[in-house]
């Protein structure tokens, strides 16, 4: 019986961890890549400037970019898995994150808030990609659906971590870019483009900025949720979900298999426990 109750507690813990971030982030609507189920169920990629389009919709009080992805690095000789969450600094500094110690983000770069399960100390600095990030705040209970601890960065830092590549890969990509320009008619007519081609990707207007996972929408008090959602739903490049729908997709998708397994174990344990108790009663009587 105690094992059965323990399995029930594990199941409730899975549900709590799965929807924790969705509850805490405080969004009314989630705008994600068209025909996808959101940043937690699958990969979602939308342009960061989509937030400006969302802000222009009547009834919208605010819109902020959101990035979510998982990385694995080595720290002190051990594997360190981190669920990286990018916050739209300065609008979102992580003030809603429950802190045990430290503070929220105050700078646009090189600061992070970490869950205590990551075993990072306040003030500790870790290298992710080509930069070093300082732990300025510690929180507890903020974990992803797989149980990995969350770490909160600004969106720009989260994207820098996600799209970091070795220097040699950058050099080869720029060389290939220059070769393509040299072999094109445009490169022969405008040789100055060769210098632009081997520069940073951010300096090339034709190349888009890094994509974010979602845009979180906050509605004005008294705004008609259905009307706002209907307006956003007419845009062919995105899909809109409510907070409740995001929770349901997490529970029906990522948590559903674990729920079924735990349910099967509970049924088996109850059945076996019933037989044992019945045999004990039969023996005593």
Residue ranges and their predicted role:
Residues 29, 168-188, 199-235:
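A short beta-strand structural signal in non-transmembrane regions
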Residues 7-10, 14, 18-21, 254-257, ...:
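Juxtamembrane alpha-helical signal-transduction segment immediately C-terminal to a transmembrane helix
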Residues 35-40, 140-142, 216-224:
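Structural beta->alpha junctions
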Residues 216, 224-275, 282-284:
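Peri-transmembrane interface segments
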Residues 9, 22-24, 87-97, 105-106, ...:
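Structured catalytic cores of enzymes that bind and process phosphorylated ligands/cofactors
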Residues 2-10, 272-277, 281:
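Hydrophobic alpha-helical membrane-associated segments
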Residues 66-69, 78-88, 95-197:
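Hydrophobic secondary-structure segments that place a key small or acidic residue at a functional site
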Residues 2-83, 103, 107-108, 120-122, ...:
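Hydrophobic, regular-secondary-structure patches
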């Amino acid at each position: 019986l105690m094992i059965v109750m323990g399995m029930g507690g594990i199941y409730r813990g899975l549900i709590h961890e799965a929807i924790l971030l969705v509850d805490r982030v405080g969004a009314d609507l989630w705008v994600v890549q068209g025909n996808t189920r959101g940043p937690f169920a699958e990969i979602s990629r939308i342009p960061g400037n989509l937030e400006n389009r969302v802000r222009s919709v009547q009834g919208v009080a605010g819109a902020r970019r959101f990035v979510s992805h998982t990385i694995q690095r080595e720290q002190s000789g051990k594997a360190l898995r981190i669920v990286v969450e990018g916050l739209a600094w300065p609008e979102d500094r992580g003030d809603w994150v429950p802190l045990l110690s430290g503070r929220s983000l105050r700078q646009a770069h090189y600061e992070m808030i970490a869950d205590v399960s990551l075993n990072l100390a306040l003030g500790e600095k870790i290298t992710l990609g080509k930069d070093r990030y300082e732990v300025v705040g510690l929180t507890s209970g903020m974990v992803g659906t797989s149980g990995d601890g969350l770490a909160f960065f600004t969106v720009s830092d989260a994207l820098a971590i996600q799209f970091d590549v070795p220097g040699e890969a950058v050099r080869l990509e720029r060389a290939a870019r220059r070769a393509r320009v040299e072999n094109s008619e445009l490169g022969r007519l405008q040789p100055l483009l060769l210098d632009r081609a081997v520069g940073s990707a951010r300096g090339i207007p034709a190349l888009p900025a890094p994509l974010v996972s979602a845009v979180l929408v906050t509605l004005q008090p008294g705004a008609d949720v259905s009307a706002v959602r209907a307006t956003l739903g007419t845009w062919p490049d995105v899909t809109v979900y409510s907070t409740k729908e995001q929770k349901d997709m997490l529970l029906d998708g990522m948590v559903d298999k674990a729920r079924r397994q735990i349910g099967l174990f509970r049924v088996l344990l109850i059945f076996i426990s019933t037989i044992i108790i019945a045999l004990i009663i039969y023996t005593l009587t």
